[in-house]
């Protein structure tokens, strides 16, 4: 049985690619046709890729792999946070800060600073500071929560990055590849499938398309982790 049906993908608009002049020829094998100057993605191939992505992701989760969801554009931001939280993954949904992976030691220190500030806020320690100092600390806390809040549970580098919009998140792609971190990527018609281990050709601009694909991947992670826990119990 298919992980995602053709009708679900059609309803979500997953078949709409970019304008034909903005395409990457490497995506040609996933393109069905062009209509009114827009490439149409072959959803039969997307369904096959989703079956593979689901199995791959489930097996990775079952073997204890750690996941990071990345998608910072407006259409994807809320969905990325929602689905990452649902499957216990870390996430970046506001802005990719240079060195998030390749300069992990520094990034980890910033995450610890965030946790310290949150403890200070909840204990009332910030409120006890002089007004100006408290305002500075709260601004720092707000900024760190915005950009690093989704990484608080990430104690080590991830094993897998799940990506929405490869071109927008090009820095994340470069850092992951430099560190040999696997990439599961939603690929629109302007992307390069050679830059990821697990390609999923689909519309990465429509909210419903992003919701559908990330939702299934989150399901796969939860299923894999449940299988891992069941194995340990036995």
From Swiss-Prot:
PROSITE patterns per the UniProt record, alphabetical: RIBOSOMAL_S2_1 (PS00962)
NCBIfam families referenced in this protein's UniProt entry, alphabetically: rpsB_bact
Biological processes annotated in GO: translation
Protein name: Small ribosomal subunit protein uS2
PANTHER family the record matches: 30S RIBOSOMAL PROTEIN S2 PROKARYOTIC AND ORGANELLAR, SMALL RIBOSOMAL SUBUNIT PROTEIN US2M
InterPro entries, A to Z: Ribosomal_uS2, Ribosomal_uS2_bac/mit/plastid, Ribosomal_uS2_CS, Ribosomal_uS2_flav_dom_sf
Gene that specifies this protein: rpsB
Domain of life the protein comes from: Bacteria
Family of the protein in this entry: Belongs to the universal ribosomal protein uS2 family.
Stretches that traverse the bilayer: none
Keywords: Ribonucleoprotein, Ribosomal protein
GO molecular function, one term: structural constituent of ribosome
Gene Ontology, cellular component aspect: cytosolic small ribosomal subunit
SUPFAM superfamilies reported in the protein's UniProt record: Ribosomal protein S2
């Amino acid at each position: 049985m298919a992980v995602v049906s053709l009708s679900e993908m059609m309803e979500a608009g997953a078949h709409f690619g970019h304008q034909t002049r903005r395409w990457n020829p490497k995506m040609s094998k996933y393109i069905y046709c062009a209509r009114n100057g827009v490439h149409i993605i072959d959803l039969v191939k997307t369904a096959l890729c989703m079956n593979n992505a689901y199995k791959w992701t489930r097996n990775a989760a079952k073997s204890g792999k750690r996941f990071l969801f990345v998608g910072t554009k407006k259409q994807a931001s809320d969905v990325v946070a929602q689905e990452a939280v649902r499957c216990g993954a870390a996430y970046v949904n506001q802005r990719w800060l240079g060195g998030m992976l390749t300069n992990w030691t520094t990034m980890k220190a910033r995450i610890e600073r965030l946790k310290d500030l949150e403890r200070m806020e909840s204990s009332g320690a910030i409120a006890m500071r002089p007004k100006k100092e408290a305002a500075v600390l709260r601004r720092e806390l707000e900024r760190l929560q915005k950009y690093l809040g989704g990484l608080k549970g990430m104690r080590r580098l991830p094993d897998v990055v799940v990506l929405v919009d490869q071109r927008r998140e090009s820095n994340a792609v470069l850092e992951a590849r430099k560190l040999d971190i696997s990439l599961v990527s939603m690929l629109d018609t302007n992307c390069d499938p050679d830059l990821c281990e697990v390609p999923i050709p689909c519309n990465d601009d429509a909210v419903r398309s992003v919701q559908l694909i990330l939702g299934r991947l989150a399901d796969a992670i939860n299923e894999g982790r449940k299988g891992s826990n069941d194995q340990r119990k036995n």
